[in-house]
Amino acid sequence: MSLDKRILSLMPYRLRQLLKLNSPYSLTINDKKIVVPLNVQDSIYNLYITRSWKTEVIGYFTKISGGVFVDVGANLGQTLIEFWLTDPRNSYVGFEPNNTCIEYLETLIDINSLDGYKVIPVGLFNENKILPLYIQNNLEADACATVVENLRPGRKYDVDSIQCQKFDDVFPELNTNSISLIKIDVEGSELEVLQGMTATVERLKPPILCEVLFTDRKADLMFMCHRNEILVKLLDKWEYSVFQIVKNYNSSKIIDLKKISSFSIEYWNLSNKDLCDYLFIPKENEEYLKLILHQ
């Protein structure tokens, strides 16, 4: 990390504001340059992005299947940047309901002239409705924001109202008939997101990279277990297999893809915090996964 980037990353956001040090920063990742806006509180963490296990997965599927990459829960463009690292010429569609994040993403796309990239300012769900978005106090671009009220009991939240839609209703507007990969990181509402894309998934059979969280220590373990059982039944109906992604010590590489038939019933802790990512793959395409491990 360069000295100026290190100094910026150590400064509190408010101090950077006072010193007018929130101008976009030109970042080089693996000899590729991208300009990163720093005008939002947690955007400083984008300075740390580098190639990771996720870059491997995105690059593999966009290479073999083409089509648009769908980023559900785009937040501050963390996955957008990793997608850009694979091949900036590919098409990207991000879904994000948080207004602060939407403005940031649009700026990121605009200042880097990322043609073929766009953000749709809605959340995804299993019906078209307005929902409350629970955002941690004083974190306007909260990466852990959720529409699940009791996902993390005891935390203090600001509540915003967001428009949510079914992916099946939005997809025709994307003017494409091919999806290379769907990434879902929606802090507990992955079941409803997937239910809302049933018609599209059954027709196109895209691979899906999805975070499924372990239960918060203060939350209802059996409630989360029941939701995950419904999720497994949905994937079975689609004839999809589930693989848990096992990463190396610094999450730069995938070391194993563990096929599972159910999600673990356990609380989140430091030992399992990096085991929340899964690949949902059509059963007939399971053999493709062997190539990911040998890239």
Roles of regions detected by a PLM:
Residues 74, 124-126, 167, 186, ...:
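Hydrophobic pocket-lining residues within nucleotide cofactor-binding pockets
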Residues 1-166, 172-176, ...:
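S-adenosyl-L-methionine
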Residues 205-212:
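Conserved beta-strand signature within the Rossmann-like core of class I S-adenosyl-L-methionine
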Residues 32, 47-70, 130-132, 146-204, ...:
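Short internal loop-to-helix segment that lines adenine-nucleotide cofactor pockets
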Residues 120-122, 240-249:
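Conserved S-adenosyl-L-methionine
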Residues 164, 225-238:
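Short alpha-helix
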